[in-house]
Regions:
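Ligand-binding pockets and gating/stacking loops
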Residues: 1-277
Length: 277
């Protein structure tokens, strides 16, 4: 049964953080219009819209030349991206060309707000060259009712996630696409009432494609499942490894924040080379 399959998530979860605002992602809604206000008003042709965007961009560029405000550059890029999305988003969301076999693989007819539908959308985004795609399933915070809810949540996630990896592979996209599946923490190994609490001392994630070894289990917890005890990977190690697979040296990539240059791995992090293909 469904239990909150639609995946609304707070916009702050998709924020660029301390990175420059031009790295801000575009939020796709799970149901209804995927991106709001992407359609031109009635009577406005694409060529007229192009003229409006060009005129606005010219004014924005003049303002930037005078003010040197980086936020203006962000606005310029956003206007241009919004114009491109007016033609690309409708094509992206048109699933009429997907075969029954593909829809059955994901277990979704598409556009129903389910995690499986979002996985299918992720594959279509990857095909079109979108470089970073983030999917959420918000149903994992099992402080209560875990025996029932963990089964329902896993059922909603497993098929779509597996289908995404299989589909990327059969289309020749997996070697160039890194799939990272996980959350920001795990759950306690002992029951707390009818659920489990947040736990950062030991938890698992999986990676597929994009330069990592397949079929490898790396690291282990103690016998209680409480503390990571073997081949411990810190979060900054994970981030350093992801950046390495993207061709980025995590020790050299920095951004100004709060008066100093920050790395995405702060002052730590090492590439976990044992998991690299």
């Amino acid at each position: 049964g469904r239990h909150g399959q639609a995946q609304p998530i707070a916009t702050r979860q998709c924020h660029s953080g301390f990175l420059p605002s031009n790295f801000q992602g575009v939020e796709f809604r799970s149901t209804g219009d995927p991106v709001l206000y992407v359609n031109s008003p009635a009577g406005v042709t694409p060529s007229r819209q192009r003229d409006v965007v060009d005129a606005t961009q010219a004014l924005n560029q003049l303002y930037h030349d005078d003010s040197d405000d980086p936020e203006v550059l962000t606005r310029i890029r956003q206007y241009e991206m919004a114009f491109r999305m007016q033609t690309s988003v409708p094509k992206l969301m048109d699933l009429s060309g997907e075969t029954k076999a593909t829809l059955d693989l994901y277990g979704s007819k598409g556009g129903d707000g389910s995690f499986a539908s979002n996985c299918l959308l992720a594959r279509r985004l990857a095909e079109r060259g979108v470089r970073f795609i983030q999917l959420y399933h918000r149903g994992w915070d099992h402080h209560g009712g875990i025996k029932r809810n963990i089964e329902l949540t896993a059922r909603e996630v497993d098929r779509g996630a597996a289908a995404l990896v299989k589909d990327l592979k059969q289309r020749g996209l997996l070697d160039d696409t890194l799939v990272v599946w996980g959350g920001e923490f795990g759950r306690t190994p002992m029951a707390q009432g009818s659920g489990r609490d947040h736990h950062i001392k030991g938890f698992s994630m999986w990676l597929a494609g994009g330069g990592v070894k397949p079929g490898l289990s790396y690291g282990a917890t103690d016998e209680f499942g409480y503390n990571a005890a073997e081949n411990i990977v810190e979060v900054h190690d994970l981030h350093a490894t992801i950046l390495y697979l993207l061709g980025v040296d995590h020790e050299k990539l920095t951004y100004p924040f709060q008066g100093r240059q920050f790395r995405l791995t702060d002052v730590s992090g090492k590439v976990v080379k044992d998991i690299l293909a």
